[in-house]
Swiss-Prot record:
Family: Belongs to the GST superfamily. Alpha family.
Organism: Bos taurus (Bovine)
Ligand binding (glutathione): 9, 45, 54-55, 67-68
Residues annotated with N-acetylalanine modification: 2
Catalytic reaction annotation: RX + glutathione = an S-substituted glutathione + a halide anion + H(+)
InterPro entries cross-referenced by the UniProt entry: Glutathione-S-Trfase_C-like, Glutathione-S-Trfase_C_sf, Glutathione_S-Trfase, Glutathione_S-Trfase_N, GST_alpha, GST_C, GST_superfamily, Thioredoxin-like_sf
Gene3D superfamilies membership: 1.20.1050.10, Glutaredoxin
Keyword Acetylation: yes
Protein name: Glutathione S-transferase A2
Function description: Conjugation of reduced glutathione to a wide number of exogenous and endogenous hydrophobic electrophiles.
GO process terms (BP): glutathione metabolic process; xenobiotic metabolic process
Domain spans labelled GST C-terminal: 85-208
């Protein structure tokens, strides 16, 4: 029997958090090997574990996978969270990419210079309420089903619900005018595996704070 997937990253959200969410939603237990020093990253690079010299990296099924989307797609395929045919996968990919676009803006917010932060937050709020949330709300309204694609849980639902939590951390009022998204969030959050992941003490990571940011900069030698 294969061992648990092993996740190599620093002890923070970053680009690994969506992978943690997807594994957790699939009910898959995983181990984490935290990169705590720059030398830990050097070792992974020097022993050939990182194809492109970067993390996240996930050891799964005898492979050392890098590149976030490749990792997510493998997990989604393995655990039947990637639709039933090519058309469904295309929709799942399209919705996931939209989630990623807004998620990137939120993820990079801690790196924003203080004098630009208010403008960046305003831009995120505008994109959230005028571009991304209306698009996803419309998908759910048009087909009247419980999930985004094929009336079945997919990685697109999980990525979107993860994003909804991040948006709520930024400003809880942004979700107020999107009842179907609120319904999706409640539905996915009540699934036993996700509910467990949302409890305190799980492998879910907290929002990036100043201390966490400085730690990441030190590990990855970011000036």
């Amino acid at each position: 029997m294969a061992g648990k997937p092993k996740l190599h990253y620093f002890n923070g959200r970053g680009r690994m958090e969506c992978i943690r969410w997807l594994l957790a939603a699939a009910g898959v237990e995983f181990e984490e090997k935290f990169i705590e020093q720059p030398e830990d990253l050097d070792k992974l690079r020097n022993d050939g574990s990182l194809m492109f010299q970067q993390v996240p990296m996930v050891e799964i099924d005898g492979m050392k996978l890098v590149q976030t989307r490749a990792i997510l797609n493998y997990i989604a395929t393995k655990y039947n969270l990637y639709g039933k045919d090519m058309k469904e996968r295309a929709l799942i990919d399209m919705y996931s990419e939209g989630v990623e676009d807004l998620g990137e803006m939120i993820m990079h917010l801690p790196l924003c210079p203080p004098d630009q932060k208010d403008a960046k937050i305003a831009q995120i709020k505008e994109r959230t309420t005028n571009r991304y949330f209306p698009a996803f709300e419309k998908v759910l309204k048009n087909h009247g089903q419980d999930y985004l694609v094929g009336n079945k849980l997919s990685k697109a639902d999980i990525h979107l619900v993860e994003l909804l939590y991040y948006v709520e951390e930024l400003d809880p009022s942004l979700l107020a005018n999107f009842p179907l998204l609120k319904g999706l969030k409640a539905r996915v959050s009540s699934l036993p595996a996700v509910k467990k992941f949302l409890q305190p003490g799980s492998q879910r990571k907290p929002p990036m704070d100043e201390k966490n940011l400085e730690e990441a900069k030190r590990i990855f030698r970011i000036k």
